[in-house]
């Protein structure tokens, strides 16, 4: 039987104050008004559809027309209770009627345990409860599918869901706040599986803003700023890699890392295309790892990506999150580890992102002397707030678990550790002890590192920390920050200063090449020749080398060999492996044409390929990287000849002698102390003709005799080519 007559009751309309808040978008519990509610022997159904011309409740085979009361509120009183299920048939002007389950009849999708853990900052899978999640519920009338939305905005006056589904209308989908948690929630039936959405937030400051979801898994392609509902059906093929990762300790393994900015490596490639081309290239060049500059969504394509606006979404510029998974999967199946740059130090002030999210300082510290980073014009996270700390720790775990990422390189750690970092006198506030240390940031970093290594054994966390803060790579249980490694910024600055000088003057700066060994084992180091050295007028590694092209090429080859031989892991920014001559620019990709035009670039690229092969095969270059037992000087003091020489030792008993001639002239009859007599094979000569060098060398090896030298029982006489490196191993 069809019924369309209107039924009335005394509770048809809500209280005027309730109605006013609903219309204004500031009602904290719209579910208490909308949906089905029993009053005596009646059930009242209310629906808030401001632009509808007709709303009908479908109860089984019966139809009940809702009366339009005011301002888009429709209601009907049904003459019975114990309503099990119903649908709404909504008609808009000029449109066909459409039938949908009522969003305001569903229970919250977050439980008390989830909210409690979040409030304490201890929810290790927070991304599974906040954000947007496709869900299905079985009802009396069948399965209802849709998307649940949840967002933290504790000081907001009201929050509504807006998107393509409702014409970006801020009235039709008001959300409810779940008690004192500050989490606003709504399940919306039939929401498109890849639909765009935002949250309309009525801020505590009276300003209404449309915000991207802080936990969005997907986004519109910038410069558009909406979030996109995203789910994954990706099937991984890297089981062997992941099983092996859990058993490894990266500190004691080979790690030579190729640093990549995806947008400018070869412009125009998608994640899926990069899965083929980038993977093949890295395998060919012999790197063990790739480090991706920030892949989390950021507004400006021409940037490195360090001002993140969607921490849980891989940038949509190159494809979907599953496409990014395919890139990681391909690298893993090729034996390449994947590190991503992660930016928990600060975030941009874009009005649609995290800043002043609910009209108050929420993710950022409320004190401007702590909550703003003056150098970058960004906000600083409030590391002491449990919910903010949980947002960041869970984000680290999200990348490690959901995308199988093998490591996080944490950007700008020094700016987190010091309250007075880059601040003028009087522009910062001390900690509770009167010091400059940011104690909350220290606790956050310790928690992040400890949790990440617990949840994902075998991963690596790397700090970009430019000061002498003690214990960066010391375990947290003995007071350290808990990082696996840190960038050795001192080594980078000293080395580049030295090799940039004309060889005539290098002898006066010999200490710049020896100083790093005074502290080489105080932390677990990565030696970075990174993106920071090819931008802002710094030129390139090639451009730093003095002399003509022949001398520049020799200088760059010897620098790279020195980097790979020095204790610590290696990192090299893209393009430097073939001696790119032009500074990086967001306007173009790498200058691959150099490989077609001159032998110097081909020679440098061949050298990097060979030193990576030698490096992986010789544990002396990596297995004792972090202990003094892995290194000893042969001669640190030959400044007159601009020569450095040292031994590297492996945990398997292997040895490697390394000698570097940074003079512009060759040295003949150069006696080098060695640990044993016999034949020593020249496994690397950076001046070899295959690298477009001059071909000066030792015919593949030398014979060491029992003539003590440099405090060692044996020695050999060598020819040292100009601006070169030689690596020798016992034959």
Curated annotation (Swiss-Prot):
A Gene Ontology biological process term: glycogen biosynthetic process
Domain of life: Bacteria
Pathway involvement of the protein, from the record: Glycan biosynthesis; glycogen biosynthesis
Residue positions of the active site: 411, 464
Keyword vocabulary terms for this entry: Carbohydrate metabolism, Glycogen biosynthesis, Glycogen metabolism, Glycosyltransferase, Transferase
Subunit structure, as described in the record: Monomer.
Similarity remark: Belongs to the glycosyl hydrolase 13 family. GlgB subfamily.
Protein name: 1,4-alpha-glucan branching enzyme GlgB
Species name: Mycobacterium bovis (strain BCG / Pasteur 1173P2)
Species classification: Bacteria, Bacillati, Actinomycetota, Actinomycetes, Mycobacteriales
């Amino acid at each position: 039987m069809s019924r369309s007559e209107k039924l009335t009751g005394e509770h048809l309309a809500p209280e005027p104050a309730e109605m006013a808040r609903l219309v204004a978008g500031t009602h904290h519990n719209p579910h208490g008004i909308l949906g089905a509610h029993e009053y005596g022997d009646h059930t009242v159904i209310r629906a808030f559809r401001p632009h509808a011309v007709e709303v009908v409740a479908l109860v089984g085979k019966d139809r009940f027309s809702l009366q339009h009361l005011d301002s888009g509120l429709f209601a009907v009183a049904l003459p019975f209770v114990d309503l099990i299920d119903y649908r709404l048939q909504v008609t808009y002007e000029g449109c066909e009627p459409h039938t949908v389950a009522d969003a305001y009849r569903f229970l919250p999708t977050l439980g008390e345990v989830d909210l409690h853990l979040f409030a304490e900052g201890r929810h290790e899978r927070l991304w599974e409860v906040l954000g947007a999640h496709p869900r299905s519920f079985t009802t009396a009338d069948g399965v209802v599918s849709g998307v649940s939305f949840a967002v933290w905005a504790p000081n907001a006056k009201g929050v509504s869901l807006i998107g393509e589904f409702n014409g970006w209308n801020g009235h039709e989908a008001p959300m409810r706040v779940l008690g004192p948690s500050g989490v606003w929630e709504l399940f919306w039936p039939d929401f498109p599986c890849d639909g765009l959405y935002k949250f309309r937030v009525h801020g505590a400051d009276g300003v209404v803003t449309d915000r991207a979801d802080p936990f969005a898994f997907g986004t519109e392609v910038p410069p558009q700023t909406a979030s996109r509902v995203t789910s994954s059906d990706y099937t991984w093929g890297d089981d062997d890699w992941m099983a092996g990762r859990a058993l490894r300790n990266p500190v004691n393994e080979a790690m030579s890392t190729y640093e990549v900015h995806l947008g400018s490596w070869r412009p125009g490639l998608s994640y899926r295309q990069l899965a083929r081309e980038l993977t093949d290239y890295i395998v060919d060049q012999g790197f063990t790892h790739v480090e991706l500059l920030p892949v989390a969504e950021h507004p400006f394509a021409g940037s490195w990506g360090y001002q993140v606006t969607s921490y849980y979404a891989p940038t949509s510029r190159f494809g979907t999150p599953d496409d990014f998974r395919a890139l990681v999967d391909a690298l893993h199946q090729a034996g390449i580890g994947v590190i991503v740059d992660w930016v928990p130090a600060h975030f941009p002030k874009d009005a649609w992102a995290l800043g002043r999210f609910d009209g108050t300082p929420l993710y950022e510290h409320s004190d401007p002397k702590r909550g703003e980073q003056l150098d970058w014009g960004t906000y600083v996270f409030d590391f002491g707030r449990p919910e903010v700390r949980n947002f960041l720790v869970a984000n680290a775990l999200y990348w490690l678990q959901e995308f199988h990422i093998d490591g996080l390189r944490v950007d700008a750690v020094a700016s987190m550790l010091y309250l007075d970092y880059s601040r003028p006198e009087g522009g910062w506030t001390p900690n509770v002890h009167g010091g400059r240390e940011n104690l909350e940031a220290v606790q956050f970093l310790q928690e992040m590192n400890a949790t990440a290594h617990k949840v994902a054994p075998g991963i690596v966390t790397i700090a970009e920390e430019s000061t002498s803060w003690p214990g960066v790579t010391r375990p947290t249980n003995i007071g350290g920050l808990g990082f696996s490694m840190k960038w050795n910024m001192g080594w980078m600055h000293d080395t580049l200063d030295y090799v940039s000088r004309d060889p005539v003057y290098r002898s006066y700066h010999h200490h710049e090449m020896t100083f790093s060994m005074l502290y080489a084992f105080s932390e677990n180091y990565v030696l970075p020749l990174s993106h920071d050295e090819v931008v802002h007028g710094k030129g390139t590694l090639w451009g730093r080398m003095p002399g003509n092209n022949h001398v520049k090429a020799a200088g760059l080859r010897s620098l790279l060999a020195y980097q790979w031989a020095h204790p610590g892991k290696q990192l090299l920014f893209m393009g430097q492996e073939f001696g790119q001559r032009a500074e990086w620019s967001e306007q173009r990709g790498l200058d691959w044409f150099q490989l077609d035009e001159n032998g110097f670039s081909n020679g440098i690229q061949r050298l990097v390929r060979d030193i990576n092969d030698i490096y992986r095969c010789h544990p002396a270059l990596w297995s004792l990287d972090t202990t003094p037992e892995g290194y000893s000087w042969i001669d640190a003091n030959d400044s007159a000849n601009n020569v450095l020489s040292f031994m590297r030792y492996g945990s398997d008993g292997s040895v490697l002698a390394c000698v570097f001639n940074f003079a512009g002239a060759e040295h003949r009859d150069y006696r080098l102390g060695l640990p044993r007599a016999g034949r020593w094979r020249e496994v690397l000569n950076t001046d070899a003709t295959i690298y477009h060098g001059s071909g000066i060398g030792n015919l593949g090896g030398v014979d060491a005799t029992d003539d003590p030298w440099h405090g060692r029982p044996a020695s050999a006489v060598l020819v040292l080519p100009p601006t070169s490196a030689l690596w020798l191993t016992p034959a």
